[in-house]
A protein has these predicted regions:
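Short, surface-exposed beta-strand/loop micro-motifs that present aromatic residues
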Residues: 81-85, 212, 542-546
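Hydrophobic/aromatic-rich, well-ordered segments within soluble, folded domains that form packed cores
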Residues: 83-103, 249-267, 654-656
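Active-site-proximal beta-strand/loop segments in catalytic clefts of secreted hydrolases
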Residues: 96, 228, 556-558
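Extracellular/luminal recognition modules and glycoprotein regions
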Residues: 61-123
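Intrinsically disordered, low-complexity linker/terminal regions across diverse proteins
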Residues: 53, 68, 280-283, 289, ...
């Protein structure tokens, strides 16, 4: 090759390199320009007196005549009004901080009622997330109208809103004919199997069959048999108690009357030609029979943790339940019939089996079987669902308005397309920096919890060792579930919700049957079909969870947003009071009354000494007493035992976060004045994050069904046990925020 040719090639390559370098530099400039643009959206990098803020100041200062002297008078009056308030911080910290906000919300809700009875940050943001998800679905469908997935998404999204009444009545008639056929052919197990083949209905079946992880070997999925959930949340309403006063008797009579009216209304809607065959009183009477069977006492050896293992032979010979024939209803035969079944209550199982054999085919029971299906079927037609709402929503739960028609679609969508919604939400909302910040925070809180257990003085060495092992092995999972599989796409029909949901339910059942007795991993999102709400580990849920059977904390992506975490304009006190408190709460669930029954690997295992458990139970009794006493001051009576696990997690969780703040100030060498101000800010933010307006009519049901106590007591009770809080606000005996001890459990 000649010299001139080599020179030309070298020059060409050099030019090419320069061009490449220039392109890289230009791309970097563009990238940096984009970053700067994005950074300018960060409030900390914006001018305070930018145009939007100047407009805000003009509006805010209108009443002050733009005059600093007037503003000083305004502040002085505000402080004077606070001094005159009866709600002093040492008497009622929650009301002291939140009363003005609650009063404003009360007025707002009169004009603009919500479909959720607890108005707080969680519900407000969750509603926003639901609407975002629906928007992602609309965008996908618009761009992929002709694809199979696009058509399926559109069908599921619209099916409840566009439910065809003729098709719905056809399904109701089919149920009517199927149940009559089972009765005519004396096939009790066939009917029980029919009910258990559809999870939308099965939770009401007299005997409920599910395939779920074995509590003592959580990697393996096994058959479980349990009692049904009855139609009324408070079982005491079914019972005529001679001790009831006149007001209680009238309440029960009215509840029964409303319930029977609701049942009759359901039958009249779904069986327009046959509804006169059925009486609502029959459902009431049948549920009382079931309640009696559930409470019988024939078997003495009953496991306190609802874990009773029976073999196929024991089920059939000792309890008289034809397990082999029942399994054949699901095409499970021969050697595939499970030989290990976990029964939650041996007494309930035995007495319910006896009750079924005697009465399952009676007219009363036929009404109950029918109603089990119809009660759920009306919920999948938006127009019909108003019947359900008027009783369970408005009368029972105190809801002022029904779910918006558009929002209602989120439930069938999450049931059918959880993975799609998960991926779309992550695609639009991924927050790597916040994820890292929160991951570090929860790991730091875990470290503090471990140190607290190491310092613990009342746990014996063996119990302490197991507790530390559990905390050390506790896994933190962020953003998305560990296992996720693609959604199955069935042939859905746009105006037939019952067909769609039943088809999907059957598909899900078959997936569970395939893994019965195995250690195969499965990703099947969970829905509570009684409450009609998502209860699994969906990434688009605004919450955080501790799961005892995996000894893990899951923090969904939807929770990693304002107001729960604010890295733009808020400091450590705010973020600890919001996100930190939640994380400390979930960590503490690992050792609460329920979590403490599971070991480091997530298996049910008693690792406590009898002496330690006795001390722990005494602490639990003290917590129950405190929450009931604090509520009693406001004239509220409730049984705090039903939610004591949440109370324990609140008390322990808040103490963990307070200790985190202590270490934070120590590391940063804060002065005493700064420490004091920091703690005050933290306590105030902890009260603000718990603020909630709950509709007055919703309170009775909340006290009976919600494992969490009312937010006022979730705020005041844990704070009252903090020594630093009591010192800063000079809480003394006789003050409302005083409790006889400062025990934070661990």
């Amino acid at each position: 090759m000649g010299k001139s040719v080599k020179h030309k090639l070298k020059k060409k390559n050099t030019t090419k390199k320069r061009k490449t370098i220039t392109e890289i530099i230009n791309n970097l400039k563009k990238s940096r320009a984009k970053e700067l643009t994005e950074e300018r959206h960060n409030p900390l990098l914006q001018k305070l007196f930018r145009k939007t803020n100047v407009e805000k100041i003009k509006k805010l200062s209108h009443d002050l005549d733009d005059n600093m002297d007037e503003y000083i008078k305004f502040i002085k009056n505000k402080i004077s009004s606070l001094k005159d308030k009866k709600d002093r911080p040492k008497d009622d910290f929650y009301d002291y901080v939140n009363k003005v906000w609650i009063d404003k919300q009360t007025k707002k809700l009169e004009d603009n009622p919500k479909y959720y009875v607890e108005v707080d940050d969680f519900r407000i943001v969750q509603d926003k997330v639901y609407n975002e998800l629906l928007g992602y679905v609309d965008d996908y469908v618009e761009k992929n109208k002709s694809s199979r997935k696009g058509k399926a998404l559109e069908a599921i999204k619209n099916c409840v809103q566009k439910a065809d009444k003729k098709k719905g009545l056809g399904h109701c008639k089919d149920v009517y004919e199927r149940i009559n056929k089972y009765i005519d052919t004396n096939d009790m197990y066939g009917l029980l199997g029919d009910a258990n083949s559809n999870e939308i209905v099965s939770w009401q079946a007299p005997i409920v069959w599910r395939i779920t992880p074995d509590e003592k070997d959580n990697k393996r999925h096994v058959s479980h048999l349990s009692s049904p959930e009855l139609g009324i949340y408070d079982y005491l309403i079914y019972i005529d108690d001679p001790k009831d006063n006149a007001k209680e008797k009238e309440f029960k009579r009215n509840f029964k009357r409303k319930y029977i009216e609701f049942i009759n209304s359901v039958f009249k809607t779904v069986l327009p030609n046959n509804y006169k065959e059925f009486k609502g009183e029959d459902v009431w009477d049948t549920e009382i029979e079931l309640l009696t069977a559930m409470g019988c006492n024939k078997i003495k050896k009953e496991d306190a943790n609802y874990y009773n293992v029976l073999t196929k032979k024991e089920i059939e010979e000792d309890y008289g339940f034809n397990w082999t024939y029942f399994m054949e209803r699901f095409n499970i035969k021969g050697k595939y019939v499970p030989n290990k079944v976990i029964v939650s209550s041996l007494n309930s199982f035995k007495c319910t089996t006896e009750l079924l054999k005697e009465k399952w085919a009676s007219n009363k029971w036929k009404t109950y079987w029918m109603f089990m299906y119809y009660k759920q079927m009306i919920r999948l037609d938006y127009d019909w669902s108003m019947i359900y709402f008027n009783f369970y929503g408005k009368f029972v739960k105190g809801k002022p308005v029904h779910y918006p028609k558009k929002t209602y679609s989120i439930f069938p969508l999450s049931y059918a397309f959880n993975t799609f919604l998960t991926k779309e939400y992550i695609k639009h909302n991924k927050k790597p920096i916040i994820e890292l910040y929160v991951k570090n925070m929860v790991e730091d809180l875990k470290y503090i919890f471990i140190k607290k257990i190491e310092r613990n003085s009342w746990l014996s060495p063996s119990t302490k060792k197991s507790a530390l092992l559990k905390l050390n092995k506790l896994e933190v999972q962020m953003v998305t579930p560990k296992y996720i599989t693609e959604d199955t796409i069935l042939e859905y029909i746009e105006d037939d919700p019952w067909y769609n949901m039943t088809a999907l339910s059957m598909w899900r059942l078959n997936q569970f049957i395939k893994i019965e007795g195995t250690e195969k991993k499965v990703d099947i999102p969970a829905i509570d079909w009684n409450e009609f709400k998502l209860v699994g580990t969906q990434t688009y849920m605004v919450n955080a969870y501790y799961r005892p059977t995996s000894n893990s904390i899951y923090v969904p992506l939807a929770y990693l947003q304002k107001p729960f975490i604010d890295m733009d304009q808020r400091g450590i006190e705010y973020n600890l009071a919001y996100m930190g408190y939640t994380l400390g709460h979930e960590l503490s669930h690992s050792l609460d009354d329920m979590g403490s029954k599971f070991d480091a690997d997530g298996n049910m295992n008693n690792w406590w000494t009898e002496h330690d458990r006795k001390i722990f139970n005494n602490k639990i009794k003290d917590v129950v007493k405190q929450y009931e006493e604090f509520a009693g001051r406001d004239g509220i009576k409730f049984n705090a035992e039903i939610g004591v696990g949440e109370d324990l997690a609140d008390i322990s969780g808040l103490s963990l976060v307070e200790e985190y703040l202590f270490y934070f100030q120590l590391i940063h060498r804060s002065t005493t004045v700064i420490k004091n101000l920091s703690l005050e800010a933290f306590y105030v933010y902890s009260a603000i994050q718990s603020r909630q307006k709950i509709y007055d009519k919703a309170i009775p049901a909340q006290l009976k069904t919600n494992p969490h106590p009312l937010e006022k007591y979730r705020c005041n009770c844990p704070l009252s046990r903090l020594k630093l809080f009591r010192e800063i606000y000079q809480v003394k005996k006789g003050d409302g925020m005083y409790w006889h001890n400062t025990d934070t459990i661990w």
